[in-house]
């Protein structure tokens, strides 16, 4: 029993890692120690009273539901206590998630009843709470279309790509939940690519590969996150190739995500890359300032946090990488305000997030952008600063200026100075020109996406 509860807690952590930001997971949940020595009970030990209270108030209900769902045991009790591990009990320290074996989404045996079918979908990830902006507008619109008409070959497969923490997983779950909302009998499964690999290997070892095939090829929709984890896994790729063909021919929906464009994924069979491109491939970019502010305000509303708009604007200006980073920052601010009893002001946020803000300032600089753009277009950095007005130089220069405005905290005059002492109005014109071209010119939009993704990595 103790071993079963220990494994249950590890599987619970896997689901929690998918459902909350990495910063929150590392701050509040990873340090917890689980005592599984008592029957039907998991006791989580927190390092101090503040952590105990925070976990109880913000995560205990979520943890309990996941654990009860995974174990099919509504009587299972999860408790949080302050202190370190009891000397007389075996306490399981948290392992690295990457090394944890996966148990909870194994393929169903042939005789398993429909009632036991588990989609692995996060019920909280919906279209309604997905904050839409220019960076993800197309992806959301197509996702909604797929949810309403799964299997339509115009968007099958749907391939979403972009950096970490930009909302790909949220959108994946939203589409899956949307499909089920339209057809409660639809067999929809969400799974991370790494878990798919583990299940495949486990099925091979247990000589249950036919059950594995039958399960995945019987689905109405298969949603696989981070498909780049298939790289170098030849056996898994071969099996997925056949599963893909079976689902596609049966007009069943396939949705995949990756951190890069299909053709850029290394060590993936060319046959698979070709199939990834059969439907629609859509980039999700880092959110622009307006979207970042909207995300912060939405998250604050969901968590019942009073966040002044000027504070949201300040955080949005400073943290530009991804949604998880924004949510992690908001949670840290809330925790500190709750602990100290102080009001959430710009000065309070600046002090609370000083390490994050200092790191962000170091990550992307105008100089980094100039170097990356020059390499991308195979020109020299000196060309970007020169008076050369030929199209082959002027367009990359405008793009670099627009990227500097988007990704750094430098003012327009400071950016202009870095590009050969140009006036701030020149920078403003460049930003407006690139914004217009991104709407009308697919090549410019693709260049922008590639550079944003590289600089934000």
UniProtKB/Swiss-Prot annotation:
Region called Domain I, interacts with DnaA modulators, residue ranges: 1-81
Domain of life (superkingdom): Bacteria
Any one GO CC term of the record: plasma membrane
Residue segments, region Domain IV, binds dsDNA: 338-457
GO biological process: DNA replication initiation; regulation of DNA replication
Residues holding ATP: 165, 167-169
Region annotated Domain II, chain positions: 81-119
Region span, Domain III, AAA+ region: 120-337
Subcellular location: Cytoplasm
Gene Ontology MF: a single term: DNA replication origin binding
Protein name according to UniProt: Chromosomal replication initiator protein DnaA
């Amino acid at each position: 029993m103790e071993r079963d509860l220990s494994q249950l807690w590890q599987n619970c952590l896997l689901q929690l890692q998918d459902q909350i930001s990495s910063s929150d997971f590392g701050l509040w949940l990873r340090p917890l120690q689980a005592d599984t020595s008592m029957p039907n009970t998991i006791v989580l030990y927190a390092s101090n009273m503040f952590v105990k209270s925070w976990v109880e108030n913000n995560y205990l209900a979520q943890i309990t539901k996941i654990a009860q769902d995974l174990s099919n045991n509504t009587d299972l009790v999860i408790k949080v206590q302050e202190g370190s591990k009891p000397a007389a009990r075996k306490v399981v320290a948290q392992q690295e998630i990457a090394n944890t074996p996966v148990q909870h989404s194994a393929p169903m045996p042939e005789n398993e009843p429909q009632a036991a079918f588990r989609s692995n979908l996060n019920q909280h990830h919906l279209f309604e709470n997905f904050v839409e902006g220019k960076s993800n507008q197309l992806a959301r619109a197509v996702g909604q279309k797929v949810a309403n008409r799964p299997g339509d070959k115009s968007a099958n497969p749907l391939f979403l790509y972009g950096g970490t923490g930009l909302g790909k997983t949220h959108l994946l779950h939203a589409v899956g939940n949307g499909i089920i909302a339209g057809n409660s009998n639809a067999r929809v499964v969400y799974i991370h690519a790494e878990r798919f690999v583990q299940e495949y290997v486990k099925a091979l070892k247990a000589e249950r590969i036919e059950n594995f095939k039958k399960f995945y090829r019987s689905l109405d929709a298969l949603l696989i996150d981070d498909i780049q984890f298939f790289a170098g896994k030849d056996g898994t790729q071969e099996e997925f190739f056949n599963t893909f063909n079976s689902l596609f021919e049966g007009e069943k929906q396939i949705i995949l995500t990756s951190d890069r464009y299909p053709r850029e994924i290394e060590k993936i069979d060319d046959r698979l890359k070709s199939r990834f491109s059969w439907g629609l491939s859509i980039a999700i970019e880092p959110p622009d300032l307006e979207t970042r502010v909207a995300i912060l305000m939405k998250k604050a509303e969901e968590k019942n946090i009073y966040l002044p708009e000027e504070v949201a604007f300040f955080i949005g200006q400073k943290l530009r990488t991804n949604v998880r980073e924004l949510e992690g920052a908001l949670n840290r601010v809330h925790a500190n305000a709750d602990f100290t009893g102080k009001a959430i002001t710009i000065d309070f946020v600046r002090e609370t997030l000083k390490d994050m803000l200092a790191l962000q300032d170091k990550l992307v600089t105008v100089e980094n952008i100039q170097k990356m753009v020059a390499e991308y277009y195979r020109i020299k950095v000196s060309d970007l600063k020169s008076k050369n007005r030929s199209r082959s130089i002027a367009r990359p220069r405008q793009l670099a200026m627009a990227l500097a405005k988007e990704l750094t905290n430098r003012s327009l005059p400071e950016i202009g100075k870095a590009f050969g002492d140009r006036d701030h109005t020149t920078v403003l014109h460049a930003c407006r020109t690139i914004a217009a071209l991104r709407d009308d010119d697919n090549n410019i939009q693709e260049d922008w996406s590639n550079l944003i993704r590289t600089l934000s990595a």
